[in-house]
């Protein structure tokens, strides 16, 4: 390792999703994207706006003015008059990953604090924290319900030795396990002391229909993060946003990189919100497909599959080695799934993709997994 690099970076590995190299067409069901592209008419509108509105020799709007206004309009539908969001409540990032990094810098950098996560969960919280040299406190979940170990969580935030917890990440619904927060978990979040920031990741809000947005004004130590990469079909454009107390938002705006979101990404996200009724109309179909897959897999004796409030399913076999073999066999047949937390996370695709997933799973199970009684 080069002598000027921080020694702890030796533990960090580059992220290489969808490595390819198989020489065959693949169903990409490992990253929880929407299986449907932007409609052609919207792509054409975006192209027209690019020609009309973007000067390539000029930097993007560093304040995200139009995009924030569109986000505020979208949020106002969800708060239903309980409170009125404004642009001062919104920060925009180059994907939610940039927001995660800014949040960590704002709260925990320089030995100021550690991060609490309940695993399994979204891996980037721990990955980004480790690249910044920030300690991560990991607690578990119930292996059947996937509810957080709240006793361990309470112990973690009240301990007085070592670096105190200054930040807690939760996902609603969680990834990879697809379960929404329970009432007990929500009650625990409501009583987290004000010196700890609670980040509620609602990346899959449009699929679950569940949000804590209405409670945000009562909790200045809460931040809700969301993304355009899932239901709004803009994974290629890397747009995420956070909603929180104006003082918190001002701090995050101060430390993010300038011109962090390309002009075309801002145009695409604004257009997606303008056309949200069209784009979100696919969600009932995806939920129907999700529930169909769940019922099909539930009767397979070699698998344990959990109910989902999102656009993916999580399942396990009898052993981690069997699960790894199953993932490899699916890939060999042309279906990419995420092997994580000793299980498989399978994105809900188009009906044709889902049929292939079922067929490939059946072939792999027949070849390698003994039936259970």
UniProtKB/Swiss-Prot annotation:
Its EC number is 2.6.1.9. It catalyses: L-histidinol phosphate + 2-oxoglutarate = 3-(imidazol-4-yl)-2-oxopropyl phosphate + L-glutamate. The keyword Transferase applies. The modification N6-(pyridoxal phosphate)lysine is found at residue 230. Its cofactor is pyridoxal 5'-phosphate. HAMAP family: HisC_aminotrans_2. Homodimer. This is Histidinol-phosphate aminotransferase. The gene is hisC.
């Amino acid at each position: 390792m080069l002598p000027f690099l921080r020694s702890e970076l030796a533990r960090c590995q580059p992220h290489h999703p969808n490595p390819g190299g198989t020489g065959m067409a693949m169903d990409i069901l490992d990253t929880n994207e929407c299986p449907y592209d932007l409609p052609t008419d919207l792509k054409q509108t975006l192209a027209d706006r690019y020609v009309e509105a973007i000067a390539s020799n000029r930097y993007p709007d560093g304040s995200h003015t139009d995009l924030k206004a569109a986000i505020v309009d979208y949020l106002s539908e969800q708060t239903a008059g309980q409170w009125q969001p404004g642009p001062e409540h919104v920060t925009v990032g180059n994907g939610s990953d940039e927001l995660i990094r800014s949040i960590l810098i704002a709260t925990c950098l320089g030995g100021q604090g550690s991060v609490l996560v309940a695993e399994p969960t979204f891996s980037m919280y721990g990955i980004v924290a480790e690249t910044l040299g920030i300690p991560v406190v990991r607690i578990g979940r119930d292996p059947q319900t996937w509810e957080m170990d709240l006793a361990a969580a309470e112990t973690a935030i009240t301990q007085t030795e070592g670096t105190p917890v200054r930040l807690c990440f939760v996902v609603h619904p969680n990834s990879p396990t697809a379960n929404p927060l329970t009432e007990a978990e929500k009650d625990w979040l409501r009583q987290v002391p004000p010196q700890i920031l609670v980040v509620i990741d609602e990346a899959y809000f449009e699929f679950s229909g569940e949000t804590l947005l209405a409670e945000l004004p009562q909790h200045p130590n809460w931040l809700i993060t969301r993304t355009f990469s899932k239901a709004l079909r803009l994974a290629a454009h890397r747009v995420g946003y956070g909603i929180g107390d104006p003082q918190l938002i001002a701090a995050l705006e101060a430390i993010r990189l300038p011109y962090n979101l390309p002009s075309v990404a801002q145009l695409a996200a604004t257009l997606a919100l303008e056309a949200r009724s069209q784009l979100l109309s696919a969600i009932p179909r995806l939920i129907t497909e999700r529930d169909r897959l769940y019922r099909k897999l539930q009767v397979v004796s070699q698998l344990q599959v959990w109910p989902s409030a999102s656009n993916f399913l999580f399942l396990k076999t009898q052993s981690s080695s069997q699960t790894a073999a199953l993932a490899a066999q699916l890939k060999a047949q042309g279906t990419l799934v995420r092997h994580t937390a000793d299980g498989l996370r399978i994105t809900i695709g188009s009906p044709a993709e889902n049929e292939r997933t079922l067929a490939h799973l059946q072939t792999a199970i027949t070849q390698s997994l003994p039936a259970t009684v």
